[in-house]
Each structure stands twice: as structure tokens, then as C-alpha cells.
């Protein structure tokens, strides 16, 4: 018995949509990484050092973004199951009107 009106199918659909968007973002980051590696050959001297420093910052930021995407996707995946279990446990303690 559920006491609250949660749209569990919507949570599952949101997780699927988020996974697709996260995959697209990871792909875009990967493409940017490849483009940067190709562009690195055109830099020389101080320009090369500056480019490498900027590229290192980009790689670090991309790693953080990927970690956050993983966390968000895992949280969405657990949300429906956790909600259903907690709601069912709380519903059994409800005595009625």
C-alpha cells in the first residue's frame, strides 16, 4: 500500500533520459579531448606550455564532471527503489483515519 503519490515510472524514465544525456556529455567531452590533442601539435614554446597547462585543467575538470554524472546517475537509479521500500515500511505503521 502506498500512501504518497510518487511517480515511480517517471523516476525510471528520468534515469533513462539522464543516462542518455550523460552519455552524450561524456562523448562531447571525449571529442573535445581529441580535438585538444590534435591542436597541441600547433603550439610551440611558451604557447605550448600554456596550452598544456590549460589542457591539464580541462582534463581535471572533465574528470570531476564525469564523477558527478556517475553520482547523479546512481542516485536516480536508487531513488525509485528506496522510495518504494520506505513508503511500504511507513505504510505498515499507519493505523488509519
Curated annotation (Swiss-Prot):
Subcellular location: Secreted
Organism whose genome encodes this protein: Mycobacterium tuberculosis (strain ATCC 25618 / H37Rv)
Subunit structure comment from the entry: Forms a tight 1:1 complex with EsxH.
Annotated coiled-coil segments of the chain: none
Pfam family, one: WXG100
Record carries keyword Acyltransferase: no
Similarity comment: family membership: Belongs to the WXG100 family. CFP-10 subfamily.
Modified residues (N-acetylserine): 2
Protein name: ESAT-6-like protein EsxG
Amino acid at each position: 500500500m502506498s500512501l504518497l503519490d510518487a511517480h515511480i515510472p517517471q523516476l525510471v524514465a528520468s534515469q533513462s533520459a539522464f543516462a542518455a544525456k550523460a552519455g552524450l556529455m561524456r562523448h562531447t567531452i571525449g571529442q573535445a579531448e581529441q580535438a585538444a590533442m590534435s591542436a597541441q601539435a600547433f603550439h610551440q614554446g611558451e604557447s605550448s606550455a600554456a596550452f598544456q597547462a590549460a589542457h591539464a585543467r580541462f582534463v581535471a575538470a572533465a574528470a570531476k564532471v564525469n564523477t558527478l554524472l556517475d553520482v547523479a546517475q546512481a542516485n536516480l537509479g536508487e531513488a525509485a527503489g528506496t522510495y518504494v521500500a520506505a513508503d511500504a515500511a511507513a505504510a505498515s505503521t499507519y493505523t488509519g483515519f
